[in-house]
Structure formats: C-alpha cells, structure tokens
Curated annotation (Swiss-Prot):
<dbReference type="GO" id="GO:0003677">
    <property type="term" value="F:DNA binding"/>
</dbReference>
<dbReference type="InterPro" id="IPR029057">
    <property type="entry name" value="PRTase-like"/>
</dbReference>
<keyword id="KW-0238">DNA-binding</keyword>
<dbReference type="GO" id="GO:0004588">
    <property type="term" value="F:orotate phosphoribosyltransferase activity"/>
</dbReference>
<dbReference type="InterPro" id="IPR000836">
    <property type="entry name" value="PRibTrfase_dom"/>
</dbReference>
<dbReference type="GO" id="GO:0010468">
    <property type="term" value="P:regulation of gene expression"/>
</dbReference>
<dbReference type="GO" id="GO:0019856">
    <property type="term" value="P:pyrimidine nucleobase biosynthetic process"/>
</dbReference>
<keyword id="KW-0804">Transcription</keyword>
<dbReference type="Pfam" id="PF00156">
    <property type="entry name" value="Pribosyltran"/>
</dbReference>
<dbReference type="InterPro" id="IPR022854">
    <property type="entry name" value="GfcR-like"/>
</dbReference>
<keyword id="KW-0805">Transcription regulation</keyword>
<dbReference type="GO" id="GO:0006222">
    <property type="term" value="P:UMP biosynthetic process"/>
</dbReference>
<protein>
    <recommendedName>
        <fullName>Transcriptional regulator GfcR</fullName>
    </recommendedName>
</protein>
<comment type="similarity">
    <text>Belongs to the purine/pyrimidine phosphoribosyltransferase family. GfcR subfamily.</text>
</comment>
Amino acid sequence: MKKELIYKALKLRDMGFPSGDIAEELNISVKTALYLTLNGEDLLKSTESPKEDSEKADIFLEWDSVRASSKRLKHIAKIMCDILGQVEFDGIVGISSGGVPLATLISDEMDKNFSIFVPKKHIHTEKEKTTGFIGQNFSSIVGKDVIIVDDVMTSGNAVKEAIKYLKSISNPKMVVVVMDKSGIDEIDGVPVHHLFRTGIVDIKK
C-alpha cells in the first residue's frame, strides 16, 4: 500500500473530513477510507506492506494531472459527449462532487439542462439520511429524460442511489463515468458506460 495514500487519508481525517468525503477525494471505497483513517498510523510504522487477498484489495486511482486542468477535463468531457451522441435526452445530472465539473462541461458542449445530485454520504447532519437530493438551484429535471455523470464509480452505491431517486421524478436513460472500479454494466435497467475500467487479476502461485 502506498504510504502517500495513507498520509493523504490521515491528513484529510485530521482536517475533519468524514470517511465518505475521504473516499471521494482519494477515489477509493468508503470501506478502504475508514480502514486507513483507523489504522493509518500503525500501517506507517509497519516495515512491510500488509498482504491483501483479492477480496479485500482496493485500487487507488490518481488522475490529478487531468482533473486539475480545465483544458484536460474538456477533452475528457468531449469523449463522454461522443458516447452520448446517439442518446436522446434533456438534461445532465452530475453526482457531487467529482461528477459536477464533467457534467457542467458536457451540458455546455451539448446545450443541455444541468443539475446535480448530492448523495447521502455528503450530507452531514445529526439525523440519519436515507437518500440524497437534487440541488434546487439548477435546472428542473422533473419528468425529463436525463443522463447521470460521475468521475469514478467505485462500489456503485452513489450511482444506485441517484438512479433510485431520479426514477421517482424523471427518466434516467444512461450513466457515463470516466473510470469504473465496480464492473457493473447496468443498474436497475439503466446502462452504465465508462471510458476506462479497472480490475484485479488474481494470480495464484
């Protein structure tokens, strides 16, 4: 396990970030983020990397050189627009927070309405939230055909939550993400498209 990743997780924890936000920032699962924040100090003291089997392994994706540049993000957004070219839809819904910049660029490129979905992992309240919500300061998507956009799909939980919510008010037709770690091709009848997909190759010696 990269020590740089552990340092980043601990730094975000000390800044007050909850596990869900740490997972979003580092493109890892919430389970891995929680593990790092609880065990990070011990892992840094260890001289050997812990052995992980294929069921426990998580993949750390770092694409800061792309997402830190609006110019480079525009190129990624244009590829996603090409994927969406044959789909008829009215609006773009970006999943907060990583999907919002991409959804903004796509909606501008394709001249579509824009909205955001805030998943429950980003809602910090004393009351337990069962689902996220659609931002009220953006275009209305009620009764419209929409596309869901995110940057990295790890477990697929945020996308599943978005689809379930959106089906109650609109018609989600497709999900498009930059990187997929889940291996999921369809969620509740909604196809999932990706630019890149990661996977674990289990080699038994």
